[in-house]
Amino acid sequence: MSSLPPAIFLMGPTAAGKTDLAMALADALPCELISVDSALIYRGMDIGTAKPSRELLARYPHRLIDIRDPAESYSAAEFRADALAAMAEATARGRIPLLVGGTMLYYKALLEGLADMPGADPEVRAAIEAEALAEGWEALHRQLAEVDPESAARIHPNDPQRLMRALEVYRLGGVSMSDLRRRQSAEKADFDASGRNQLPYTVAQLAIAPEQRQVLHARIAQRFRQMLEQGFIAEVEALHARSDLHAGLPSIRAVGYRQVWDYLDGKLSYAEMTERGIIATRQLAKRQFTWLRSWSHLHWMDSLAGDNLPRALKYLKTVSILA
């Protein structure tokens, strides 16, 4: 058995059943749950993020939920620091850190560090180009000035290539290009010869998703409509009424929230908002699958299987996470 303490990663696309399995594991093992979700960090954003209810959170406390106001940003680097601290605290108490969520960049940050600039992402670039077409590059330059004033000062509004790259870097990691460059120098001593941090844990990586993609699509559509029935629009109305929030913030760009925000702005009909919200969620799931397909050492489980808990426990024993 490894001398390193154990940790469990439970990944998967949105609406796959990660939270239910995580809570079942928490009932069976001495675990502490740590959220790996870039939307669950925000207070007052409960329905549209499918945040566990207060009752469930009281029974199954999660670290890194409700730690930011929607007006604030939260980078992958900040997540890494917070998650490592939470994992260390759990280990010190003799418990197993169980990290659950679908923000794959956060998992990557934990396993590999954040020394490198993120690579180009065609979907993020397509989204930026669409915004530029609708709003103009000057509007995007103003957006960059809010999140990375140093880069905005260097980049002219009529330089779309560099402007797109700076926005892309921020959107992919939640940290500005300027900050990344500074951290590359400051954190260089913490990196090993391969250029990657080594996570000081023996990590078992579980992934859950329906075997059939159409099953996941149906679950996504059903859940989005349930969110609307549960008061999602009223939740976004409360955010929309705040003068310090706008559509360019990471919180409001979260899947579902941007579509309801546009509905409240009169840009979309109710039917269009519903359709686009479902489509955006499916696109998120597709991106998550793309990450997961490139992941190594994953143990996959079918969301619809009735024996995922015993299967997960059996796997954890085979990889020496459990005695």
UniProtKB/Swiss-Prot annotation:
Q: What is this protein called?
A: tRNA dimethylallyltransferase
Sites marked Interaction with substrate tRNA: T103, R125
Q: Which gene encodes it?
A: miaA
Question: What Enzyme Commission number(s) apply to this enzyme?
Answer: 2.5.1.75
**Top-level taxonomy:** Bacteria, Pseudomonadati, Pseudomonadota, Gammaproteobacteria, Pseudomonadales
- UniProt xrefs under Gene3D superfamilies: 1.10.20.140, P-loop containing nucleotide triphosphate hydrolases (3.40.50.300)
Q: Which biological process terms from the Gene Ontology are attached to this UniProt entry?
A: tRNA modification
State the organism named in the record. Pseudomonas aeruginosa (strain UCBPP-PA14)
Which Pfam families does the UniProt entry name for this protein? IPPT
On whether ATP-binding is a keyword of this UniProt record, the answer is: yes
Provide the residue span(s) of the region labelled Interaction with substrate tRNA: 37-40, 161-165
- A single GO molecular function, which one? tRNA dimethylallyltransferase activity
Q: Which family does it belong to?
A: Belongs to the IPP transferase family.
Annotated positions binding substrate: T14, A15, A16, G17, K18, T19
What's the catalysed reaction? adenosine(37) in tRNA + dimethylallyl diphosphate = N(6)-dimethylallyladenosine(37) in tRNA + diphosphate
The cofactors named for this UniProt entry are:
Mg(2+)
Q: Keyword annotations for this protein?
A: ATP-binding, Magnesium, Nucleotide-binding, Transferase, tRNA processing
Q: Which residues cross the membrane?
A: none
Purpose: Catalyzes the transfer of a dimethylallyl group onto the adenine at position 37 in tRNAs that read codons beginning with uridine, leading to the formation of N6-(dimethylallyl)adenosine (i(6)A).
What's the subunit arrangement here? Monomer.
- Which positions bind ATP? G12, P13, T14, A15, A16, G17, K18, T19
